[in-house]
Amino acid sequence: MLKKLMQSVLPELGKNSRKAPRDVKYPGKRDAVDGNTAVIMVEREASDAAGAYPITPSTQMGEYWAEAAGDGHINISDRPLIFVEPESEHAAAGVTAGMSMTGLRAVNFSSGQGIAFMHESLYAAVGKRLPYVLNMGCRAITKVSLNVHAGHDDYHCIDDTGFIQVMAKNAQEAADLNLIARKTAELSLTPAIVGQDGFLTTHLIESVMIPERELVAEYLGRPDDLIDTPTPAQKMLYGPKRRRVPTLWDVDTPLQSGTVQNQDAYMQATAGQRPYFFDHIEKLAEGCMAEYGELTGREYQRISTYLADDADYLVVGMGSMIVQAEAVADYLRETRKLK
């Protein structure tokens, strides 16, 4: 059955799904890599610093970052990479937050129980408006027994923290969504999570158009760039222009952070998150996706669809299963006339 499925689908795959290629400025550089590698090939150009503790199946991301740092890799900001491996995932979340507070473009990598362990720190990262990216190799959280393979327990256990969340279906999306999530995070001042399925994407080698270093530089810019403040609420805080990654901890201009708020002030600060920050994310994300599509030809939407315009049946999902679901949709249309 599987052989018949592939023989039927492969010649037709993409006939209805892919637009004709067009000339774009940054089509990418073709390579054969897994999802973990695709992430690091982007992050080592974009980011300044990583705080991470290794955990399967995202271990390779931290390892590859550490290798790049050890080799003296210089990113688009002309900085050598910084890597700190503390004693746990909980500490890694604090380290990454601290890096972001000092104005560095920061990143973390984790999975499964590691995400659950750092859970409490993620709320504070949102409340402090720290625009870092957490890369997640999505893994089942231990219940009746240990399982290191794919599951979305960790991805959904942080739904209530306020992080921006995006999920890649393959290694190509893991690379592209890192850049899109990063730009959205830095414009909205809200941290972002980029998920990919453990082993099914993190360790599966496939053909990927790796984003060029020049694309990363043009699309993201440097963390110390002065940009036009993108929202009215941010203008109240920073004025008409601000640093792309704000510096909250600065030894030259020290300030206090994380103070105690009693009921009235805490209520106002918490309620104000939505109108002043969260409500702007949708528009900012759509703008970042549109700009990325113009530069690369690879277009993204907040909710992606496949052959849905005239469909009678819809399969709803996320992650690596989408690749198979798209192939099944092609097969059923071709062989069963089912839409």
Feature annotation, model-predicted:
Residues M1-C157, G162, L179:
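Thiamine diphosphate
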Residues K15-K19, D23, L189-G195, L295-Y306, ...:
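Flexible, glycine/charged-enriched surface loops at secondary-structure junctions
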Residues D34-V39, A290-Y313, E326, D330:
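Glycine-/acidic-rich phosphate or pyrophosphate-binding loops and their flanking alpha/beta elements
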Residues S77-L81, A192-S304:
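Conformationally flexible catalytic loops at phosphate/diphosphate-handling active centers
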Residues M118, V144, H203-I205, Q324-E326:
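Short helix/loop capping segments that flank catalytic or ligand/cofactor-binding pockets
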Residues R139-A140, D197-H203, G319-M321:
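Glycine-rich beta-alpha junction loops
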Residues V148-G198, T202, I210, Y219-T229:
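Conserved thiamine diphosphate
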Residues A325-K339:
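Generic long, charged, amphipathic alpha-helical segments
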